[in-house]
């Protein structure tokens, strides 16, 4: 599994990356949607993109669709903010992962 994390790699996001690596995922990271798109356009591919809910999820997903880049997008955010989860799903994310990360939840998403 190749995981691209689109967020600042700190705190709970860093913890989620570590859990994913423990489960065998190859993890890469960018901080912005533009950086993520550039990476995906280049030689880097990802089976799963995990993006911070504070970033432009809808722009990422629209760009992926327009450029015919096929990958699953999952949003993540601190706590159980129901409104943030709804916005992320409405923007096109397949799931919302609350942070701090739960090892079993990370494992389920990677499967």
Region spans (language model):
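A short, hydrophobic beta-strand element within the central beta-sheet of small alpha/beta folds
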Residues: 4, 49, 70-81
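Two-component/phosphorelay signaling modules centered on CheY-like receiver
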Residues: 8-31, 35
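Acidic, metal-coordinating helix/loop segments flanking the phosphotransfer/catalytic sites
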Residues: 31-48
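Short amphipathic alpha-helix used as the core "switch/output" element in two-component signaling
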Residues: 56-70
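Alpha4-beta5-alpha5 "output face"
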Residues: 65, 86-90
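A Lys-centered signature of the CheY-like receiver
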Residues: 99
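Receiver (REC) domain switch/output surface
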Residues: 106-111
